[in-house]
């Protein structure tokens, strides 16, 4: 695709980001500000602007017209900034305590100005350091239960949902997910990235036609099931957390109307990838998170259904159970795709890539591929999170 920048668009620098904050009236004109680029993501520029005298800061996030992880050879739409700010505002209608405040957004500059969350840390980093965040999965379950229900056909008038589907149409970023999660890792594709010691396992996976058919079915669900407004990229790097129990979900630029089970599947996959990086005696908190996130999501979604479902749904016996059953099966399959993608595809996770020694890193990555394939192929047999955990632990013993 070709990205067209508007006449107003210019890439921010540390000095121009600070000037923008003053121009918007977010700091007094005579403030002495410091501004530092803090982004380490694949797609955007992120600046923290701070007034030491007032001890107050904010974050300015700007989309750039290409994928930073690849370079200008991979152009991307700037409209993802609008998607992100709109998603955060909608999520805040239901879980304001779990998302950052949006102070300002500008579609021409592709800028979103956000609450400063520097008192928290990225959950992935904390989990790698051995922190457990006991409230993390309960918060994510509540976030998903409420945001997924209240943006679904079970809560919305059909015309409202149709309008939202159009508002959050996000073809470029959906194409990234389709390629990097559901397609490329299952073939010998140039975007794949892995150690040569994993080639034998990768080639076995590429030759598994039954697995590839199941992955294609999951891709079809991802592309066609316009069930609710999903976050679209809910891994542990998209979550800020604090040991005092505070949680904030960030970066919903991949948001669009997709299957209910996708977000929870991605979150579970990243929990289990972290579990692979730990010794067995340190994995119990991750197993608890897997159970808690599903149980909290299911309970929250069910309570919202009982209170606020449209009348037609309330009179359909078994409909809620069917929706949750499909979401759980999908979540298991999507988790499997995510585990495989994060092991041999583009954009790895530090949970695996920082394992030492190298020999253990390779052995754990081989397990990630094996577990991912099992989750995809056996997803219809999973009934509870305990089934996922049992499959995970059994793979470790084999």
Curated annotation (Swiss-Prot):
Catalytic reactions of this protein: 5-(methylsulfanyl)-D-ribose + ATP = 5-(methylsulfanyl)-alpha-D-ribose 1-phosphate + ADP + H(+)
Residues that, per the record, bind ATP: 44, 61, 115-117, 251-253
Keyword annotations from UniProtKB, A to Z: Amino-acid biosynthesis, ATP-binding, Kinase, Methionine biosynthesis, Nucleotide-binding, Transferase
Residues bound to substrate: 233, 341
A Pfam entry, by short name: APH
Domain of life per record: Bacteria
Keyword rRNA-binding found: no
Gene Ontology molecular-function annotations: ATP binding; S-methyl-5-thioribose kinase activity
Coiled coil ranges: none
GO-annotated biological processes: L-methionine salvage from methylthioadenosine
InterPro entries membership: Aminoglycoside_PTrfase (IPR002575), Kinase-like_dom_sf (IPR011009), Methylthioribose_kinase (IPR009212)
This protein's pathway: Amino-acid biosynthesis; L-methionine biosynthesis via salvage pathway; S-methyl-5-thio-alpha-D-ribose 1-phosphate from S-methyl-5'-thioadenosine (hydrolase route): step 2/2
Gene3D superfamilies in the cross-refs: 3.90.1200.10, Phosphorylase Kinase, domain 1
EC number: 2.7.1.100
Enzyme class: transferase
Subunit structure: Homodimer.
Function comment: Catalyzes the phosphorylation of methylthioribose into methylthioribose-1-phosphate.
HAMAP family, alphabetized: Salvage_MtnK
Family from the record: Belongs to the methylthioribose kinase family.
Listed name of the protein: Methylthioribose kinase
Record organism: Bacillus licheniformis (strain ATCC 14580 / DSM 13 / JCM 2505 / CCUG 7422 / NBRC 12200 / NCIMB 9375 / NCTC 10341 / NRRL NRS-1264 / Gibson 46)
Gene: mtnK
